[in-house]
Amino acid sequence: METVRGIIDAIKPQRTVFALEMMPWVFPDSADTYLELIKAIDRKGFGVHFDPVNIISSPRAYYRTGDLIRDFFSKLGPHIRNCHAKDILLRGNLTVHLDEVIPGQGVLDYRAFLTELHKLHPDTPLMIEHLRTNEEYQQAADYIRGVAAELRIPL
């Protein structure tokens, strides 16, 4: 926390925020722990980067992605400054094995994700990541745009 405070205090961001990306193996690992971190850091220049796939680390979370997303936005919406877009798929390997996949090829509830994201500032970035080819990025973008169109959400 001291390091984050030090960075924010030194930079004194005016039009941006410093945010930590959630990862499955380190804190913050949930909406509640991210909220605790925001309170502990106690700086206006600290915000939230939301990557829902990075906090899906159990079958319980995997089968309830819509609930996880809605809970995260309800608790942290005003602090969210950008999001990552990808998808997740549970494989039949032992032990629990979760893979990142192209949006639309997994179980992430993009209807919930885009609905909640649409409630934020219209310039909140949604960035597709970790794909291998331009074609995969195009496929991902087409899927996300298709879901948004079904929901009548402009992108």
Spans of model-derived segments:
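N-terminal pre-domain/capping segments
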Residues: R5, R43-H49, D67, T115, ...
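Distinct, well-ordered alpha-helical segments
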Residues: V26-F46, P59-F73, Y137-R145
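Gly/Pro-rich active-site loop or hairpin
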Residues: A31, N54-D123, R132
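Active-site acidic/histidine proton-transfer and metal-coordination neighborhood
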Residues: M1-F50
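Helix C-cap/helix->beta junction micro-motif
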Residues: P13-Q14, K44, H79, L120, ...
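C-terminal appended segment following the main domain
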Residues: L117-L155
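A structural alpha-helix within SAM-dependent methyltransferase catalytic domains
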Residues: M1, R5-K12, L35-K39, F73, ...
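Hydrophobic faces of well-ordered beta-strands that scaffold small-molecule active sites
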Residues: F18-L20, F46-F50, R81-H84, T124-E129
